[in-house]
Amino acid sequence: VKQQTIHLFVFDTLADWETGFAVAGLNNPAFQAQPGRFRVSTVGIGKAPVVTIGGVTILPDLAIDELAPEQSAMLILPGGGSWDEGGNTEALDLTKRFLAAGVPIAAICGATSGLARAGILDNLRHTSNAREYLAATGYRGAALYQDQPAVADGNVITASSTAPIEFAYEIFKKLDVYSAETLEAWFGLFKTGDAAYYGAMTQPANANA
């Protein structure tokens, strides 16, 4: 199986919890339909270290200007305060290049406001932290806002800051990370804490369906 790289955009103020479930599931071969198919790589505006909202220092694997869409299976954009300050415009330019090349992107929390400001959500069903939060950007897609934890429309996934599990679920579904049965068991386990779902995940038929 040819390994595919998922790129996680990293920047100062990144909200640690929002992409934790997604990147762990992608990078860890356990229970995957094709174990080891994905690896996660970090991309920064430059290659200087960044510090998350939780105080974790991350050294980006590469800079945005070194990344071409054809090298990637998906771009993940976490939330963080800098989006609301009008930052990360380089990541929005990269997002447009990804979508033009037919490569999916996934944005959560503040990153959705960045997409809204860039006009990317004007014609797509989407969600965010709140309808009013995106409306404040002055974007033209308000009629397509969905009051849901996470929404997938074509090659764009969006989610609320309080929905890291649903965000990961939509990413895993889009990329066929797990079999359908394993994906539902994974979601049930982390959403409810019911250990019975773990048993379903470990069934051989589910692990490699």
What residue spans do the PLM features occupy?
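Membrane-interfacial amphipathic helices and adjacent loop/beta segments
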Residues: 42-54
